[in-house]
Every structure is written in C-alpha cells, then in structure tokens.
Amino acid sequence: MSQRALRSVNGALGWVTLWCIAITSALLWPLFTNGYLLTRSGVSTPHSYITPSALGIGDTLSCSVPQDTFIAIVSHFMDGGLAVKILLFLALIFAGLGAAGLGWYFLFPATRGQALTQGLAAATFGIWNPFVVERLLQGHWSLLLCYGALPWIALTGTMVMSTGHYTRLTAWAALTASMALAGFTPTGAIMGILFALLSVGLPKRPIDVSELRLAIDHTSTPLKYWQ
C-alpha cells in the first residue's frame, strides 16, 4: 500500500472502529442484559466441564470441538456465559474491521474521505448481513467467531507473498493466528483452510491506477518536446 493510501487509512481507522462497535452493539443489544445465551444451538452456562464429548472422544461425533473444551477451561476463571458474550461481540467487530481492511487493501483510498467511505460500507456489510443474522437466530456463536477470522485470513493470505521481508513475517504470523481462531469449530477450520489456499494462490495486489497514471504522465512529459 502506498504512503498516501496508508495515511488515508490511518485517518479513517478510528472512525471505522467506532462504527463497528456501534452496529455490533445495535445487533447484540439483548446480550447486554442479565442472563445467558439460550437460543437453539447456543446454550451458555456459568460453568462447564471437560467431558469426553467436549474432547471429541465420546460415543457420537462432536461438532463442537474445541469450543466446548475452551469454554470449559475459561469457565473456571470467569463466568462462561459472559465469556460467550464477549467472544461473540469481538467476533463481529473483527469481521467488520477485516472487511474494511480488504477494501482498503484492494481499492487504494487516495484521501481520508475515500478511506472512510470504503471502510464504513465494507464494515457495515461485514457485520450486518443475512448470514450473521441467521447464525445469531440459530445460536451459532462459535461459527460467527470463525466468520470474524475469515476476512483476516483472506487479507493476510494475499500479503504472505509480499516482497518485503518484515511484511511477509508479519503476514505469516497474522495468518497463523487467524487460522487458529477459525479452527474454533470443524466447519470454521475447513473454511479457514480453503480461504488460506485461495488467498495465497491469488495474484499480487492490483496496481494503484492513480499512481500508474501519475507515473505515465511523468514519463511521457519529456517525449512531448520531441513531437
């Protein structure tokens, strides 16, 4: 990303983050009251325990590994229901910021206004969409945690082939962390692997059209004197 685009993004990042918090709060406001998440598949309790089913070694195939094990461990230190609320809230914020990051990376905002417009639009779509609402109604909070990691997998996956040494190292570290977050459920792990393979295999970031035109203008200017 060019220095101009980077400055534009830095100027808009704070406002986009606040917007992500605002629309996530509007979407999850019922969870701010007392009580626990009890919606279809989403059942949270103050305390959970490590059982054979939570470890995936029970009589039936478990589709909630390792989320049940993680919550069982966390519930020994804090309220398990509160932990689920916090994770769900952060997941949607990460989804919005990840969507905004993808937009900035590929669209090259030239001004702070462009970066703000792109970021707000992408973040809104990343958080407030039919998929998220449906998963909330089904109680699939852990799948939404994986969903929040997918934009970051796509973003960091496209950056691991960067020419900069430190950029590659940072991208690999961020990609590994995002993959671990996506692996909170088996479905999320599969989606994370697919996203990583697709993003790493994609061509490099497109050329900044405005900078390309500027370079052409500077290059072609001396030729005008020969015409």
Explain the meaning of each model-derived region.
Residues 1-29, 217, 221-226:
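Start-transfer (signal-anchor) and selected internal transmembrane alpha helices
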Residues 8, 78-85, 110-113, 183:
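Juxtamembrane loop-transmembrane helix junctions in multi-pass integral membrane proteins
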Residues 11, 15-18, 85-92, 117-120:
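Alpha-helical transmembrane segments of integral membrane proteins
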Residues 20, 96-106, 115-206, 227:
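Membrane-embedded helix bundles of polyisoprenyl
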Residues 21-99, 124-147:
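Membrane-interface coil-to-helix junctions
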Residues 32-36, 40, 163, 204-208:
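Transmembrane helix-loop junctions in multipass membrane proteins, especially transporters and channels
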Residues 76, 176-178, 220-222:
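Membrane-interface segments at the starts/ends of alpha-helical transmembrane spans
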Residues 204-221:
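Short, basic, low-complexity termini and linkers enriched in Ser/Thr/Gly/Pro
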